[in-house]
């Protein structure tokens, strides 16, 4: 059993690839945050003001997650990965964090994005994990294993 977990939400598969590599580099277990209702291409159309992803921008929105990590208590560090949607994490990440008591754990956000940085992401996630310590996190687009190793060291 690893002391670290890499949990990730990936709508298109891009975050999944980074999460798998990060888990390998960090020697961490891997958990996919799967929505109870899968996203379609239409759901992800950010140009449509009525698309699901646009409606879920509401900070109070909590999309349901299909499964839980049964052994969260075993981990000291939880890396949480996601795409950046409108400068923050998708609200399903808040749903995931709120499902656990993360007090005393280190939460390390990581993201990928077509052009956004972390922005207000960490500030928006902190209320969902009271008592956890948050690292600054980073956007990990197309990074090398050496960069992932440096990210893990910097997040320790």
Q: Each predicted region: which residue ranges?
A:
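Short, aromatic/basic amphipathic alpha-helical patches
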Residues: 120-129
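Short beta-alpha junction loops
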Residues: 111-116
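A short helix->loop->beta-strand "cap" motif at the edges of active sites that frequently abuts
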Residues: 103-106, 131-132
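Structural signal for conserved beta-strand scaffold positions within catalytic alpha/beta enzyme cores
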Residues: 32, 109, 136-139
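Glycine-rich phosphate/pyrophosphate-binding loop and the adjoining helix
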Residues: 133-156
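N-terminal beta1-alpha1-beta2 submodule of the flavodoxin-like/Rossmannoid cofactor-binding fold
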Residues: 1-80, 87-89, 94, 98, ...
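Redox-cofactor binding/interface segments in oxidoreductases and associated redox assembly factors
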Residues: 80-81, 109
């Amino acid at each position: 059993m690893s002391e670290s977990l890499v949990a990730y939400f990936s709508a298109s598969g891009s975050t999944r690839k980074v999460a798998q590599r990060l888990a390998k580099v960090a020697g961490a277990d891997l958990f996919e945050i799967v929505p109870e209702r899968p996203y379609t291409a239409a759901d992800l159309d950010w140009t449509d003001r009525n698309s699901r992803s646009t409606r879920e921008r509401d900070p109070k929105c909590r999309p349901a997650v299909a499964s839980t990590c049964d052994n969260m208590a075993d981990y000291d560090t939880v890396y949480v990965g996601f795409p950046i949607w409108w400068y923050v994490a998708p609200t399903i990440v808040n749903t995931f964090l709120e499902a656990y008591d993360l007090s005393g754990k280190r939460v390390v956000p990581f993201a990928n994005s077509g052009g956004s940085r972390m922005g207000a992401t960490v500030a928006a996630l902190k209320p969902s994990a009271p008592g956890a310590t948050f690292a600054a996190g980073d956007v990990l687009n197309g990074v090398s294993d050496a960069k992932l190793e440096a990210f893990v060291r910097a997040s320790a």
